[in-house]
Amino acid sequence: DKIGTIDYESEKVLLDIIAEKYDALADTEDPKMRAHLQQIINDLSVRAAEYVIPNEFDRLISRFGGTKLNAGTSYDYTLYFNTFSPQYISQWAEINSERLVNPVFRLFQSELETVYEEKNMYGDTMASVAIEKLTERYFYPHPYAYPIIGSAENLKNPRLSEMRRFFEKYYVASNMGLILSGDFDTEEVLPILESTFSRIRKGKPPHRDIVALPPFEGREKVSVRIPMPFVKIMALGFRGV
């Protein structure tokens, strides 16, 4: 809440209302009501954007020699990474720990559109459709059956409140790790990391249920229609040991 805004208190009032409207949007299937709520969300988002300092985090990282700022998500982890000049370790640690203490989910609407674009980009390829269906059946009822980027239905009904609950559950120190590589003095760096990243909530590591995969009942087939005539694709999956 200290990075990316000129007035967080005023911005937060609007962001809280936006979160409530997203919950209401997810709770209704009425087309007229959904259109009405989407218009309200859009109007509020425009007002909230007036308090935003675009890309301030990126610029701060770059100011201190940082490059290749990016993030990635897989089935079991989310990672954030970039390179930076070692003489700026103090600034780097301050900036990166700050965003994990109390993140603000601003510009959610535009970020959601970016996710939609990525979903559609991969969904238009033949292999992606086949592999997604194979993975869905192969791992059911394990969470791996669910696509990493989310389902189309889920993306149509996003909830900022769920994002906040996810953060509070999983973004605790006991469930996180920090990896540094390069030319630096460990004895000099450790006190800096302890004074900055120790601000992250301790918390208990989230409980994870072990989901046993039921055996296949002989040979199973899943048919998938792809929007390309005269093209056939096949994917096979086998359980290992």
Can you describe what each PLM-predicted range is?
Residues 186-190:
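Extracytoplasmic/secreted cell-surface and envelope-processing proteins
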Residues 2-8, 47, 82-112:
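M16/insulysin-pitrilysin zinc metalloprotease superfamily fold
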Residues 95, 192-196:
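Alpha-helical scaffold elements adjacent to nucleotide-binding pockets in ATP/GTP-utilizing enzyme cores
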Residues 5-87, 121-175, 195, 199-241:
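Non-catalytic beta-strand/loop surface segments
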